[in-house]
Design a protein with these regions (language model features):
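Positively charged, Gly/Ser-enriched RNA/tRNA-binding surfaces
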Residues: 1-52, 96-175
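Short, conserved phosphate-binding/catalytic loop or strand-edge motifs used
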Residues: 18-22, 58-66
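Glycine- and acidic-residue-rich phosphate-binding/metal-coordinating active-site segment common to enzymes
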Residues: 55
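Internal, well-ordered alpha-helical segments in soluble enzyme and binding-protein domains
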Residues: 38, 60-63, 86, 138
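Hydrophobic mid-domain F-helix/FG-region of cytochrome P450s
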Residues: 41-47, 62-72
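Acidic, His- and aromatic-enriched active-site or binding-groove loops in soluble protein domains
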Residues: 73-99
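Short glycine/threonine-rich loop-to-helix capping motif typified by GTGT followed
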Residues: 65-75, 164-170
Length: 175
């Protein structure tokens, strides 16, 4: 599906409450096979919707949800910081909590943690948590399975817009 969506905007006054949203429902094809089918369908459909210079941004709800588990009762604050991509608040958040150093370094990188496949490789090298690493590996596997890799970036600080998201997430941007 693809169409106009209207959402009440409380945080950004003056921001349009109308935007376009597309979605795909895929059943009975779990894991990489299903994710690849969805991505391929999206990539093949985009030229038909008259948008120019489309960039696809991939994130992981599994990665995000694990971060929330790791920060425990500080999850709401982390969610707000990531949603706003507030670097100074993230520094304050890390300094006031007693997380492991590897988690601190990961958290500090998240507000600006978006880029190409090289960024994903760098983050995989830094990740110490097996669930986080598994989520990053799933993104890497998806990327490597695609025939068309151009105009795909990763955003590891992406916040799911719906609580029920569990796997990869995608946002599209156009001129």
């Amino acid at each position: 599906y693809f169409g106009k969506v209207y959402r009440k905007e409380t945080m950004h006054k003056g921001r349009s409450s109308e935007f376009f949203q597309g979605g795909v429902e895929l059943m009975n094809k779990p894991g990489l096979q299903g994710d690849k089918e969805v991505m391929t369908m999206i990539q093949e459909s985009l030229p038909g919707i008259s948008l120019k210079n489309i960039l696809l941004e991939l994130g992981s709800a599994k990665f995000y949800n694990r971060l929330l588990e790791l920060v425990g009762n500080q999850r709401n604050e982390l969610e707000d910081i990531l949603r706003l991509r507030d670097i100074s608040e993230m520094k304050r958040f890390v300094s006031k909590n007693d997380f492991e150093e590897s988690l601190n370094q990961l958290l500090l990188s998240l507000p600006t943690c978006f880029g190409n496949i090289d960024l994903l490789h760098q983050m995989m090298d830094k990740c110490q948590d097996s669930v986080l690493l598994g989520a990053l590996q799933e993104l890497k596997d998806l990327y490597e399975s695609l025939d068309s890799k151009e105009k795909i970036i990763f955003d590891l600080g992406m916040v799911p817009t719906m609580k029920y998201y569990t796997g990869f997430m995608i946002k599209g941007y156009s001129d």
